[in-house]
Amino acid sequence: EKDIRTTVVKITTENGARTMGRPQGSYITIEAPGLSVHDEDYHREISLEIARHLQNVINLERELSILVVGLGNSAITADSLGPHVVENLHITRHMIREYGLQSLGKEKMHRISGIIPGVMAQTGMETAEIVKGIVRETEPDAVIVVDALAARSAGRLGVTVQLADTGIRPGSGVGNHRSGLTEETLGIPVFAIGIPMVVGAAAIVYDTVGAMTEVLRERVECESSDEEKGTKKEKTKKEAIKTEETEEDKETRKNGGKWTKEEPRRRDEKRMIPEMLRVEEAFELVKELLKPDLGPMYVTPHDIDERVDFLSYTISEAIHGALFYNK
């Protein structure tokens, strides 16, 4: 009803992991076109959907200590989603430690702590090094990592929420390969939440070429269909106009197909477009072609400030909903 679509992919075997190119685990994608609009009711519904999935992947049967890590550079708007989420959180760990649950009027509550580790250019340290030290000293039961992502398609920019129970590799979307925040590196479960906030120039060009190719394909098929209809109308004619036949044309005629002088040209047009689409490496090719002039260029929406602001509240409210209001 609200045009929200959720896709859950579970990779449970090593063969599946190799095929998908991802570690074993659960991957959840929530597609919500309305996220680009500041509609409080719509965003509240998305928060509830995210909270429901967080409750499914995190074992919340007992009281837990949860560390929320806001990845990204708070000085760059498109990369500041994680820091904004942590700033919006209701942090409870210190209050429960000092004053007990009674100070919050609760009999049971998860202890939430948060950290904004910044980026290596600001701290001189890997994010993984900072988080490892915090995990070692504060001993949380699990980590929730929030980060802005790079979209592979312009259509997913700011309108999809991705969750995973396999952790995250900071900066990998924009070519900065850093140490991962995973259960293997931290020793505790790591859950990742991300929203694509930038899209590469290569992705925009790739989408455009793909759309143009699809239009050309439809046009060729439409013209071909019109010609077939015209041929049927002229069925009363005793003989079609023929030109020199190729071996392929002879085979077509032998199998009961019709052949006219227009068909070789039309057949070549049909064959050309699938050939273009068959190349799976097209995206990498586009990146290489753009590299000399544009390099690793990334684009953001014109209203990125506003989007980061209300999307950060959507995520922080989802975390609150999962940890404070779970049954």
Predicted regions and their residues:
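A structural-propensity feature for long, helix-poor, extended segments
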Residues: 104-134
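Glycine-rich phosphate/diphosphate-binding loop of Rossmann-like nucleotide-binding domains
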Residues: 73-110, 114
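Gly/Ser/Thr-rich loops at beta-strand to alpha-helix junctions
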Residues: 71-81, 121, 148-152
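Short glycine-rich or small-residue beta-strand-to-loop segments that form or flank ligand, phosphate
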Residues: 29-33, 65-76, 114-118
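A structural signal for small-residue-enriched, beta-sheet-centric alpha/beta enzyme cores
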Residues: 115-116, 145-326
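Conserved acidic residues
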Residues: 66, 141-142
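Extended, charged alpha/beta regions that create polyanion-binding interfaces
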Residues: 1-63
